[in-house]
């Protein structure tokens, strides 16, 4: 009987462990990597999903609605921890000169038709801890509408630009 109970306990523990591992995180960590002008670029972010909120992720004035009801004109451009950019060489992003290094990316979405990429020198922050005094600078992004709704937020690097797409929005900026 003792042996049977022990086997049952091991089986239950294994089953619980397996079922706990089957639930993916709500906003999984993602990495976009690429080379532009021979310089390696990596963007690390967490990718939220639209999850049935199409048309309700962004308000009419461009502010993102958060789960706890707050609205932020400066967005971490992802979920959870702040989005980071690393490069092994000096870049020009839009009209902003960015020396080699690691930075935090934010996006000013206060105007729904004209987003602005913010490159911030302070790294290791939670996404809502924006400090404008640490900005390296800002540059305008080119807005477009994706061909289809983008369920999972995605950053891409290639074709001489960095692009952010989510829901019915896409914004890109040239890099060289």
Regions found by a protein language model. Give the residues of each.
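Targeting-peptide/extracellular-domain and disordered-appendage signature
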Residues: 21-99, 104-176
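Sec-dependent N-terminal signal peptides
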Residues: 4-14
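Sec/Tat signal peptide C-region and signal peptidase I cleavage site
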Residues: 16-20
């Amino acid at each position: 009987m003792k042996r049977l109970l022990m086997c049952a306990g091991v089986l239950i523990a294994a089953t619980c462990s397996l079922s706990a591992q089957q639930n993916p995180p709500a906003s999984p960590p993602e990495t976009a990597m690429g080379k532009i002008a021979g310089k390696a670029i990596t963007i690390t972010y967490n990718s939220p999903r639209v999850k049935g909120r199409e048309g309700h992720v962004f308000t009419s004035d461009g502010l993102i609605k958060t789960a706890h009801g707050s609205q932020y004109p400066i967005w971490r451009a992802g979920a959870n921890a702040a989005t980071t950019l690393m490069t092994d060489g000096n870049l020009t992003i839009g009209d902003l000169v960015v020396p080699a290094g690691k930075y935090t990316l934010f996006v000013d979405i206060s105007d729904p038709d004209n987003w602005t990429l913010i490159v911030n020198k302070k790294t290791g922050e939670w996404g809502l801890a924006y400090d404008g005094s640490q900005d390296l600078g800002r540059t305008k992004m080119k807005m477009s509408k994706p061909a289809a709704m983008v369920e999972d937020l995605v950053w891409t690097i290639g074709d001489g630009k960095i692009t952010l797409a989510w829901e019915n929005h896409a914004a890109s900026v040239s890099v060289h």
